[in-house]
C-alpha cells in the first residue's frame, strides 16, 4: 500500500511512521510511504 502524507498545516510538522522513521515537512511538502504487502503492524 502507498500513503501520501501532505502537510496542510501553516507550520512545520514532524511526520513519523513505525517502521520507517520520521521526516520534517514544511507547509505544502509531502512524503510518500510504501508499506510492503503482508505487513501486520505499523503506525503512522
Swiss-Prot record:
The family this protein is said to belong to: Belongs to the thaumatin family.
Q: What is the lineage of its organism?
A: Eukaryota, Viridiplantae, Streptophyta, Embryophyta, Tracheophyta
Could you identify this protein by its name?
Thaumatin-like protein 5
Q: What is the organism of origin for this protein?
A: Glebionis coronaria
Highest taxon of the source? Answer: Eukaryota
Q: What upregulates it? A: By phytoplasma infection.
Amino acid at each position: 500500500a502507498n500513503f501520501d502524507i501532505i502537510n496542510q498545516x501553516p507550520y512545520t510538522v514532524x511526520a513519523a511512521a513505525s517502521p520507517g522513521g520520521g521526516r520534517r515537512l514544511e507547509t505544502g511538502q509531502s512524503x510518500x510511504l510504501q508499506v510492503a504487502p503482508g505487513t501486520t503492524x505499523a503506525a503512522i
